[in-house]
């Protein structure tokens, strides 16, 4: 333990149970531990959705209980410039971005990492993410979290091995029920607090209402794959591929009552294209093209290789073959067709437990008709 006693770790305290237990685990490992609460969003809509104040109070209560100092920092300007504006631009272009991935890249493992090292003298930062780190041949690899249900490596694929090397992930070695049990034993205020599910800055608020404040909605037609107009949408940005709920259309005489699914968006003409059945051929893809690639611990792809991929969080691994197209684009071919591959989302690659990296889905490769 003594080799850690000179090492200072700044834990990103979110006011949740995972970061709370992370701080305690690091104390047990002998580190000098301090907390940092990041405010990434300037609330301007009253207290309806604002959890920042109560989250800060919970983070402070945990730090008081553990006897550690809590620092606060405001990254709202960085968040707006580097995460939120990109998020809006993607939606405007008809794609479905994942802002949590960008937030980890630009805020938690960039702005926070720099602030902790330069202003607080940290040797490491730590977060409550369910991932693991393994140091092999002088490089730090990113591994899936031990708890398969909670593994968050999908959200951290943009980290380089140097960022992973400066980060600790204490709860990644545990299963979620064990983390809750530890928090209850320690009588932490966060022990029974539910996990946050909203997009990192929007929180739990109604997504459609929030987006409408920044992007004017443009209603348009809902058209079937056969060209029949069967309804009206309130804005393409509110819909994503594979979506079933919230379309406001029932079954048809020919198709029976089988539910409708979004299978495509015609951004140019502002048309939402739908088909009946969750496995309709128009919803299936045989592969994808990915760009804006980030590899955690490997060189850029120069030759084909096989691995597995996830095209969204908590999806089962999809066996695939990856081929380079050019310096920053790859073609991914699935072993079996996959439903609802969504441009703008991330494709993240794995070899066993190791997260290799990933990229943004530029286009899907549709099932040949």
Curated annotation (Swiss-Prot):
Gene3D superfamilies: Adenine nucleotide alpha hydrolases-like domains, HUPs, Translation factors. GO terms for cellular component: cytoplasm. ATP binds at residues 12-19, 38, 128. Its main location: cytoplasm. Coiled coil: none annotated. Keywords: ATP-binding, Cytoplasm, Disulfide bond, Nucleotide-binding, RNA-binding, Transferase, tRNA processing, tRNA-binding. The active site is at residues 103, 200. The record marks 129, 345 as: Interaction with tRNA. Residues 150-152, 312-313 are annotated as: Interaction with tRNA. It catalyses: S-sulfanyl-L-cysteinyl-[protein] + uridine(34) in tRNA + AH2 + ATP = 2-thiouridine(34) in tRNA + L-cysteinyl-[protein] + A + AMP + diphosphate + H(+). It holds the Pfam family tRNA_Me_trans. Its EC number is 2.8.1.13. GO terms for biological process: tRNA wobble position uridine thiolation. HAMAP family: tRNA_thiouridyl_MnmA (MF_00144). Belongs to the MnmA/TRMU family. NCBIfam families: PRK00143.1, trmU. Interacts with TusE. Catalyzes the 2-thiolation of uridine at the wobble position (U34) of tRNA(Lys), tRNA(Glu) and tRNA(Gln), leading to the formation of s(2)U34, the first step of tRNA-mnm(5)s(2)U34 synthesis. Sulfur is provided by IscS, via a sulfur-relay system. Binds ATP and its substrate tRNAs. This is tRNA-specific 2-thiouridylase MnmA. The lineage of its organism: Bacteria, Pseudomonadati, Pseudomonadota, Gammaproteobacteria, Enterobacterales. The gene is mnmA.
């Amino acid at each position: 333990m003594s080799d850690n006693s000179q090492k200072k770790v700044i834990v990103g305290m979110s006011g949740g149970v995972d970061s709370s237990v992370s701080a305690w685990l690091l104390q047990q490992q002998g580190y000098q531990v301090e907390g940092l609460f990041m405010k990434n969003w300037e609330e301007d809509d009253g207290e309806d959705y604002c959890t920042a104040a109560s989250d800060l109070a919970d983070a402070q209560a945990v730090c008081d209980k553990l006897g550690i100092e809590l620092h606060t920092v405001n990254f709202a300007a960085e968040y707006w410039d580097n995460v939120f504006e990109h998020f809006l631009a993607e939606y405007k272009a008809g794609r479905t971005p994942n802002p949590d991935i960008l937030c980890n890249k630009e805020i938690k493992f960039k702005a926070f990492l720099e602030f902790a090292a330069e202003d607080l003298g940290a040797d490491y930062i730590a977060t409550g993410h369910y991932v693991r780190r393994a140091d092999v041949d002088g490089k730090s690899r990113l591994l899936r979290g031990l708890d398969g249900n909670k593994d968050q490596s999908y959200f951290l694929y943009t980290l380089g091995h140097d960022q992973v090397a400066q980060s600790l992930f204490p709860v990644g070695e545990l299963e979620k029920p064990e983390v809750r049990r530890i928090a209850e034993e320690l009588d932490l205020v966060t022990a029974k607090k539910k996990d946050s599910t909203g997009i990192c800055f929007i929180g739990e608020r109604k997504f459609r209402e929030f987006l409408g404040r920044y992007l004017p909605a443009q209603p348009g037609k809902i058209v079937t794959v056969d060209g029949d107009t069967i309804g009206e949408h309130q804005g393409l940005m509110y819909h994503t591929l594979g979506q079933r709920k919230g379309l406001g259309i029932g079954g048809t005489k020919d198709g029976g009552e089988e539910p409708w699914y979004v299978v495509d968006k015609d951004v140019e003409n502002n048309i939402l294209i739908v088909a009946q059945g969750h496995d309709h051929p128009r919803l299936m893809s045989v592969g994808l093209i990915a760009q804006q690639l980030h590899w955690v611990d490997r060189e850029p792809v120069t030759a084909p290789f096989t691995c597995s991929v996830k095209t969204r969080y908590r999806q089962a691994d999809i066996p695939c073959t990856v081929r380079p197209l050019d310096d920053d684009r790859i073609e991914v071919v699935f072993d079996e067709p996959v439903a609802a591959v969504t441009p703008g989302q991330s494709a993240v690659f794995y070899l066993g437990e190791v997260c290799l990296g990933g990229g943004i889905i530029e286009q899907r490769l549709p099932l040949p008709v």
